[in-house]
Amino acid sequence: MKKKIFAGAVTLLSVAVLAACSNSEGKDIVTMKGNTITVNEFYDQVKNNGAAQQVLLQMAIKDIFEEKYGKDVKDKDVKDAFEKSKTAYGTAFAQVLAQNGLTEDAYKEQIRTNMLVEYAVKKAAEKELTDENYKSAFENYTPEVTAQIIKVDSEDKGKEVLEKAKAEGADFSQIAKENSTDAATKEKGGEIKFDSGSTDVPDAVKKAAFALEENGVSDLVTVPDSQYSASYYIVKLVKKSEKSSNWKDYKDKLKKIIIAQKEKDTSFIQSVVAKELKDANIKVKDSAFQSVFAQYIETTGSSTSSSSAASSSKTSESSSAAESSSKEASSSAAE
């Protein structure tokens, strides 16, 4: 599923104006009969625009995180994420860039900035690996199961296949091979293994599987793909694992779950960004921009902005995500 990758995009014009004003304060931008528009006059208008304020916030975040974590984000990773996104959008990619006022280089910068924040968030999340958090994650953890799934694209098709799958003596493997649209499992008769921390299986499918007894077949499971479409799953549970009473038996898996949860936690991400901005001793000199920074740092005479600037740095989409184990490049863009 393609995800929005330019939710936090702003026009290059705003970026250029904010970057240039300090070097050309009195310069005329436009002249006309009886009047002129100077850089200062334009700046006074642009700086009160929400998109322009987000630009400045993103510029500050980029510079601060680049200074501290730049060596930890490789150019190859940025390039790979960019190419993955470009492939996902296909022939529409150039048009989407243009609609959002971005060049390819500007989009790569967005991806890099987001990766810098992702790295910082992951490092901060690793500090949350306390026994208490391990035990909390363990309480909600379901060990690996072996299941078979059939995925179809319409509810009518799903009902038709479900009737076959629940028929006495039904060969679920053969039904999956003949009907499933899931390329990763179809030729294996739908077989797949996952636990509650797996990110390559929809949550609704996991929930349905965990509720079954061995050899049980679920009802039709609806998984929304977007606002306007959905996929439909039928799940058969093949084998369950007994859950150990000792959380340490699952420590590696629980570690991944804890970190993944933190990477999707907007409040946690915002706290990481806030700490980095505070450590950088950032000061906001123009009162017009105080509100957008107030979510992260104390600014004299400012009030908290009603819109969340965390969207300019959060992971997806993820990480957002679901899909965090096989991220689309969209989760690498600043949202």
Curated annotation (Swiss-Prot):
Enzyme Commission (EC) number: 5.2.1.8
A cellular-component GO term for this protein: plasma membrane
Stored InterPro entries: Foldase_PrsA (IPR023059), PPIase_dom_sf (IPR046357), PPIase_PpiC (IPR000297), PrsA_foldase (IPR050245), Trigger_fact/SurA_dom_sf (IPR027304)
Boundaries of every PpiC domain copy: 142-239
Pfam name, any one: Rotamase
Lipidated residue numbers (N-palmitoyl cysteine): 21
Reactions catalysed, as given in the entry: [protein]-peptidylproline (omega=180) = [protein]-peptidylproline (omega=0)
UniProt enzyme class: isomerase
Residues carrying lipid (S-diacylglycerol cysteine): 21
Gene3D superfamilies: 3.10.50.40, Porin chaperone SurA, peptide-binding domain (1.10.4030.10)
Biased composition (Low complexity): 302-335
Region feature (Disordered): 300-335
Signal peptide: 1-20
A GO MF label: peptidyl-prolyl cis-trans isomerase activity
GO biological process terms on file: protein folding
Subcellular locations according to the entry: Cell membrane
Keywords noted in UniProt: Cell membrane, Isomerase, Lipoprotein, Membrane, Palmitate, Rotamase, Signal
Mode of membrane association: Lipid-anchor
NCBIfam families: PRK01326.1 (NF002361)
HAMAP family: Foldase_PrsA
Family: Belongs to the PrsA family.
Function recorded in the entry: Plays a major role in protein secretion by helping the post-translocational extracellular folding of several secreted proteins.
Protein name: Foldase protein PrsA
